[in-house]
A protein has these predicted regions:
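C-terminal motif of bacterial Sec signal peptides marking the signal peptidase cleavage site
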Residues: 18-22
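Short helices/loops that flank or line small-molecule/ion binding pockets
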Residues: 86-94, 113-114, 214-224
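Bacterial N-terminal signal peptides that target proteins for export
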Residues: 1-11
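Bacterial signal peptide processing site
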Residues: 24-27
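Basic- and aromatic-lined ligand-binding clefts that recognize polyanionic substrates
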Residues: 33-54, 145-201, 272, 302-312
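A short, structured surface patch at a secondary-structure boundary
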Residues: 39-102
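Structured C-terminal subdomain patch of bacterial secreted/periplasmic proteins
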Residues: 38-39, 128-133, 138, 147, ...
Length: 312
């Protein structure tokens, strides 16, 4: 089996730079005293929402298509999460720049040279996000806010697991579409980790820390998933068009039991994305409706492909 590599294609490496990084350890500094001035920058929409929930003041925000919390509207923008402007960040003289650790490998060397202090947080799983929240709460004296969020997380997860107790765990394959290609989500990716969190089995297992793999269809067929889930990253409309063509024109998919039994489903890429967000309960509820309740309409690739070809 062939592990996903950056060298497969330039387009892939650009879109997936964040997912190919090795795990970065968080190194929280000593707690900040009330007398110390803080100038914090958040570099992604996910970290922006965490800062808002913790009540942290910021001096700049990422350029994002997502909703910006009211408290941060009008602040300077420092570029997108995958390509922040290191020079602009340095000019703002931050005391801390908070970003997802999946971007550390591509961003850290440039910003280290500019003397920018970073705190990398783990958004590759729900647990990782709440561990990061606890760390930031400790660092910035937001213990109460952090504990409230952690308690809500524990209660929500316990309630979900009670709801699915005793049900048979299906075997699930999750594919993430890119313009012109797709990759399979391992349990080390956020989207892939949701499968196990929902009590199902992710059929894509690896021995290393890879978030995604690029296996051919014959290798995926051998995994014999009960359910196939489709999500997207980067130009999602193009990615879903790619899926409709792939499932309609590549005959090997007809041999997948999940396809034969109409157990292929399209997911909301905004919920099943690269980084954990506070929408994770919606993601679990969606998985429950698909793999346990069977209340979601399956994906109709042929209809979608015909509509794409006709331009409707």
């Amino acid at each position: 089996m062939h592990i996903w590599r950056k060298t497969i294609a330039l387009a892939f490496s650009t879109v997936l730079a964040l997912s190919l990084s090795s795990c970065v350890n968080q190194h929280p500094a000593a707690p900040i005293s009330a007398a110390e001035e803080t100038r914090i920058i958040a570099t992604s929409n996910a970290t922006l929402k965490i800062c808002d929930k913790l009540g942290l003041d910021l001096v700049a925000i990422p350029t994002t298509i997502g909703t910006v919390p009211e408290r941060y509207q009008g602040l300077p923008e420092i570029g997108t999460a995958m390509a922040p402007d290191a020079e602009q960040i340095a000019l703002l003289q931050p005391t801390d720049v908070i970003g997802p650790d999946t971007l550390a490998e591509s961003i850290e060397p440039t910003d280290q040279a500019a003397g920018v202090p970073y705190t990398w947080i783990d958004l590759q799983s729900v647990k990782g996000m709440y561990d990061s929240i606890a760390m930031l709460g400790e660092k910035y004296g937001k213990h109460s806010e952090a504990q409230t969020l952690i308690s809500q997380y524990e209660e929500t997860l316990a309630e979900f697991h009670r709801a699915i107790k005793g049900v048979e765990a299906p075997r699930v394959l999750m594919l993430m579409g890119l313009p012109g290609a797709y990759i399979a989500c391992t349990p080390n990716s956020y989207a892939g980790s949701l499968i196990d969190l929902a009590g199902a089995e992710n059929v894509v297992q690896v021995d290393d820390e890879m978030n995604f793999v690029s296996w051919n269809t014959e290798e995926l067929l051998a995994l014999d998933p009960d359910v196939i889930l489709l999500t997207a990253h980067g130009l999602p409309e193009q990615a879903m068009e790619m899926f409709s063509k792939e499932f309609s024109t590549n005959d090997i998919w007809k041999h997948f039991r999940a396809v034969q039994e109409r157990q292929v489903y399209q997911l909301d890429y905004q919920i099943f994305g690269m980084s954990c967000t506070f929408d994770w309960p919606k993601a679990l509820e969606t998985l429950k409706e698909i793999i346990y309740d069977k209340t979601v309409e399956p994906y109709d690739a042929e209809t979608a492909y015909a509509e794409n070809k006709s331009g409707t």
